[in-house]
A protein has these predicted regions:
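Glycine-centered flexibility motif
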Residues: 15-16, 79, 125
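Non-cytosolic coordination micro-motifs
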Residues: 29-67, 95, 99-175
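Bacterial N-terminal signal peptides
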Residues: 14-24
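A general, composition-driven signal for non-globular sequence regions
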Residues: 5-8, 23-25, 32
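N-terminal, post-signal-peptide region of Sec/Tat-exported proteins
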Residues: 51-90
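Bacterial N-terminal signal peptides that target proteins for export
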Residues: 2-16
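Generic marker of residues within folded, mature protein domains
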Residues: 20, 74-76, 130
Length: 175
C-alpha cells in the first residue's frame, strides 16, 4: 500500500488560522504582481493583462535603460495607497514599483513597512535587511526576481516602496 499522508485536523486548523491572519494585516491582497503580469513581458502584453494601464506622459528614467513608461490604478496595501509604475528596457518589463507617500502617516509608514516585511517573510522566507536612521530596507530573491521593500522616514519625503525587478547577475570581471 502506498504511503499516503492524510492531514490531521490540527494541521488543517493551523493552515486556516494562518490564512485568517493574512487578511487582518491589510497587506496581503496586493503585493503580488497583478494577475497576468510577469517580468519579461512586452508593453502590448501588459496592456492586454491590464487594459486600464496608461502610458506615463513624463516617464521616469533609471539606470540600465529602465523607463517607467506605464502606470496602473493605485492600490491599497497595509493602510497606504500605492501607485504602481511599470519600467521597461529593451522592450521588456523589467521592474514594477509600488510607491506610497507616507508624510501624513503618524509613523511615516513604519507600520506599513512592517506589514510588508511580514508578508515577504511569509512568501519568500527570511529577508536580507538593513536599517539606518533615515530608512529601512528588506530584500528577497525568488528565482529570477529580486523583491524589496523600502521605507524612507524623513518627515518631508516619507514613503514606502515595494519593488519587483528582474534579477541581474554580474560576472566578477564586469565589476
Amino acid at each position: 500500500m502506498p504511503n499516503v499522508r492524510i492531514p490531521t485536523l490540527s494541521s488543517l486548523l493551523r493552515v486556516l488560522a494562518a490564512s485568517a491572519i493574512f487578511p487582518a494585516t491589510g497587506a496581503l491582497h496586493a503585493q503580488a504582481l497583478p494577475p497576468g503580469v510577469r517580468l519579461g513581458m512586452t508593453a502590448d502584453e501588459l496592456q492586454a493583462a491590464l487594459p486600464a494601464a496608461e502610458r506615463v506622459h513624463r516617464p521616469q528614467r533609471l539606470t540600465g535603460g529602465l523607463l517607467g513608461s506605464w502606470r496602473a490604478a493605485p492600490v491599497e496595501m497595509a493602510g497606504l495607497v500605492f501607485e504602481p509604475t511599470f519600467f521597461f528596457a529593451a522592450s521588456e518589463l523589467r521592474r514594477v514599483e509600488y510607491v506610497a507617500t507616507a508624510q501624513s502617516a503618524p509613523d511615516s509608514g513604519a507600520s506599513a513597512f512592517g506589514q510588508l516585511v511580514q508578508w515577504g517573510r511569509g512568501v519568500f522566507g527570511n529577508e536580507l535587511a538593513s536599517r539606518d536612521p533615515g530608512s529601512a530596507y528588506a530584500a528577497w530573491t525568488s528565482g529570477d526576481t529580486d523583491v524589496y521593500v523600502q521605507q524612507i522616514s524623513d518627515p518631508r519625503r516619507a514613503s514606502v516602496r515595494l519593488v519587483y525587478k528582474a534579477r541581474q547577475l554580474r560576472d566578477g570581471s564586469e565589476l
